Structures are given as C-alpha cells and as structure tokens.
C-alpha cells in the first residue's frame, strides 16, 4: 500500500527525534492523513506479513465490551499481555468505552449500538461519532486509547469512516489499525445495508521507534502486492453476532514477516 509506505518515508525524511514514555526514543511527524478506497481491496500491508487472526479477534473483543485479555489468550492473541494486570484486566479500555461509556452523571452509553441505530435513522447526521477518550477514566486504564475517536459518513449509499489516532507506532501498530478500522467499516456497512466508501486515517504523532528504523527501510525496498478481498457472512445481521469464522480475507499475499520489538 503506497499510502502506508509514503508515511514511513515521510517520517524517515522529516521526522524529529523525540523522547518517549518507553525510553526507546522515536522519530516523529505531527499530522498525517491516509485515504483508502475500500472498494479497491482490503487495505492490508503487503510489504510484511500481518497476523490477521490477531486483528480480527481484537476487534471482536472490543465489540463485545470485554476488557480482560482472557478471550484473546484463549485464541492465541498476545498483543495486550504486556499491559494486563495479574488477573488479566486492563481497566476501562476500548471495549468498555465503546459499549458502556460512563458520563459524569453515572449514565452509560452503548456507543456502538447508538451509532448503528443513528446511521439507519439519520444517515446525513454529522454526529455519527464514537469516542474512546473518557478523561474521567484515563487514570484507570492500563494504556490510554491511541486510536481514540472515529466518525462515520454516509453518501450515495456508501459508508465511510475517519479515525483520529493521537499516537501511531508506524511500524508495528499502524498496519493493525488500518486493517482493524477497515474491517469495522465493512461490518457496520454490512449491518446497515450500505456499501463501503473510504477509510480515512488521521494520525497526530506519527512515529517510528528508533529500534524499528532498519525494519522500515527494508519494507521500503519491497514492492507492494495486490490487495486482498474481505468476505463477510451474509447471514449475520447484528454486528454483535459476528464470530471469527464469519470473516474471511481472500487472496492475501505478502512479503515475509519482519520482527520488531514492542515498546512498552
């Protein structure tokens, strides 16, 4: 995907060295946007192999409202292990905010159900937004949300989605985020009777950890391969009923995996 490789090249060319929470160090740019036409193929990075199983299970986990890593571990997904406590809990992270956002008055809102209902009721609304950024609960979270707000947009029978991500680990995290929100857009379009439009990915602090520089340079030498297709089970009518086997990526071909250490 040229859009992703262009981001990597921009960070290498223009990035500013910054200290970070993990002590690893980054090179960073501020404010970058990528746009993917979802009708042209499913946007999975092909210049290294992605573990789509982890992406699908993580999204299903978010949508369930769960915030304990047990489900992920039972399905061979370890991407949240470093942040979980001894009981596997992460505090009120994404799933909690998506499905039971708690306001100052103690009222909870199922934002996913609300936004799907609102797309059906009022597709021209400019308020089709889900936020995972709850300032009152940030200190209870194992990790404050990086991909923190997304907005849907309906035009000409097509559903588009824009994500705002405050912080993007461009080598390890951003390819996952692109695929995850593209999948979410397909799923929401499916249950609202719409076609897919664009996925727009806006990143605030887009960075490369300094111990990922050589891996990214290797990726930039590789020619992107054709994008795969996404197939969803047509019998599923509720977004909360999707299971792993209802989601299939067809024709994914990639260059070999490139290892990179996670900065915790």
UniProtKB/Swiss-Prot annotation:
NCBIfam families with a match to the protein in the record: PRK01827.1-3, PRK01827.1-5, thym_sym
Compartment annotation: Cytoplasm
Identification of the protein by name: Thymidylate synthase
SUPFAM superfamilies in the record: Thymidylate synthase/dCMP hydroxymethylase
Any one GO molecular function term: thymidylate synthase activity
Domain of life: Bacteria
Binding site for dUMP: 21, 126-127, 166-169, 177, 207-209
């Amino acid at each position: 995907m040229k859009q992703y490789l262009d981001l990597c090249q921009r960070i290498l060319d223009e990035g500013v060295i910054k200290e970070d929470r993990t002590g690893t160090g980054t090179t960073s740019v501020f404010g970058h946007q990528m746009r993917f036409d979802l009708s042209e193929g499913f946007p999975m990075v092909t210049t290294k192999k992605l573990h789509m199983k982890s992406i699908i299970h993580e999204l299903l986990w978010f949508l369930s409202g769960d915030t304990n890593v047990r489900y992920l571990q039972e399905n061979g997904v370890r991407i949240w292990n470093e942040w979980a406590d001894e009981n596997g809990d992460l505090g009120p992270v994404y799933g909690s905010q998506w499905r039971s956002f708690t306001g100052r008055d103690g009222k909870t809102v199922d934002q996913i159900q609300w936004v799907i209902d609102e797309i059906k009721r009022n597709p021209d609304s400019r308020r089709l937004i889900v936020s995972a950024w709850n300032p009152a609960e940030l200190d209870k979270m194992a990790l404050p949300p990086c991909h923190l707000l997304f907005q849907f947009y309906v035009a000409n029978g097509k559903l588009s989605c824009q994500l705002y991500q405050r912080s993007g680990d461009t080598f390890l995290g951003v390819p996952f985020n692109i695929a995850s929100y593209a999948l979410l857009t397909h799923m929401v379009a499916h249950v609202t009777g719409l076609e897919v439009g664009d996925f727009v990915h806006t990143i605030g602090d887009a960075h490369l950890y300094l111990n990922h520089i050589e891996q990214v340079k290797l990726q930039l030498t590789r020619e992107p391969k054709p994008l795969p297709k996404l197939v969803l089970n047509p019998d599923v009518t509720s977004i909360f009923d999707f299971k792993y086997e209802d989601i299939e990526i067809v024709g994914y071909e990639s260059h070999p995996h490139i290892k990179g250490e996670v900065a915790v």
